[in-house]
Amino acid sequence: MEQKLHLIPYQVNEMVEVVEVVPKGIELIAAPKVWENSKGKGITVAILDTGCDVTHPDLSERIIGGRNFTGDDDGQPDVYIDYNGHGTHVAGTIAAINNGTGVVGVAPEASLLIL
């Protein structure tokens, strides 16, 4: 059976990018108040998840290393690319830096070990 596809044209009126530098969840746990005493400097947090986007501008400075324990990328231990996005999100929630390009994490000066 042949079907006809009808496309409705659209026009972009305006483009809006809304980014909260300090996400609501970070505010809700009062992290900005804790930053008066510590932003996580000297602390390493291991992220055991789906990997991490090591080129992400909010994370690349925080990542000190990692290890791939999966069969992804032919099991290469030093390649821990995130093909899912969840591990990158978790890493950002924990330690995204406050660089004005995205959001800030709970401990923006902590180091990340991606597992």
Task: Give the role of each language-model region.
Residues 3-111:
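Active-site core segment of subtilase-fold serine proteases
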